């Protein structure tokens, strides 16, 4: 028998807090501002660590993609924390709409919520393919444009941070610059500014110019690529 899952309705936009997994730290911090500007009350989750992954493994088959374990574990850990009004909380997860199993994460999450004792929690889908047509969360063209702008800003901040951080004279200077620009961009985004291509073309050089002011010592560095997320580790 098919489970009749709770739907995220348009009315919930005003009454519910939407929890969002932190899948790309810098980009998602900016995406939160875009969603808030569009009228959604949302929060990017910051809980992480091996306990989160183990909680996801408890409610999801171990053959499932590891990102699904992390995302579902992060959601369940947040709901278990007691910080949220469970009658006015919703979850948001992405759907690719392609052949990847990521399109099915939303169904795995709904099953996990029932198993964990949260059958009343609605899950909204963030996708660009017209999936979940009965959902009250709609990716409109204006919202999509705002989200894309946030991703561009986030990608640039990450690229500049990675170019500066290994050589900075003062440890943490690049990360502090990222935080300052996220706060600055956030204020602009909440005011409805910074989304257009003209505004982005104006802002990108300003960001690069400020990163260039960070004192660095350019010395040869061994380059190692680490595929890593703090959500999956103790981060020690």
Q: Where do the model's predicted regions map?
A:
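An N-terminal assembly and electron-transfer interface module characteristic of large anaerobic redox
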Residues: 1-231, 236
